[in-house]
Amino acid sequence: MRVNGSAKLVCKTRVKEVSPDGEPILVEPMGNFTVIKDLVTDMDSFWSKMKSIDPYVKTDFEPEAEHIASNESMTHLLGVMNCIMCGACVSECTAMEVDPTFTGPAALAKAYRFVADPRDEETNSRLGDLNKSTGVWDCTRCLACVEVCPKDVAPMER
């Protein structure tokens, strides 16, 4: 939801933080989502975009056991792996206000998670898809997504 004009996790937001002197608090539905009713928004477009980046490790072989990557090769992914899919970044994305077909910061962060995974063998294909219209180049780099992310994923700093 949006609290006083900014996306927040209302389950973790304390009234004292947003209204230290007791001023009125404005609670609104998330931006860039269709409102179903009151504060409820339709997240279908969010999940469709997430699905469109094919969020799975792809290999050309069938591993005989679990395909484990070393800790060293995965530490740079910890930030994007912390994403809780709350949609706060999408709610604040100025590029999505202009073009709702833009892939968006959450899906781009998730895409980075697989592009940078050493076990994934579809990196070139993924990068080709992200290089198309509505992909990474539609981002305006305003960093609004970075400011509101409750888990410090920093989608556009990847």
Cite the ranges covered by each PLM segment.
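Hydrophobic/aromatic-rich structural module bridging two neighboring secondary-structure elements via a short loop
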Residues: 1-31
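Ferredoxin-type iron-sulfur electron-transfer modules in oxidoreductases and energy-metabolism complexes
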Residues: 26-33, 37-158
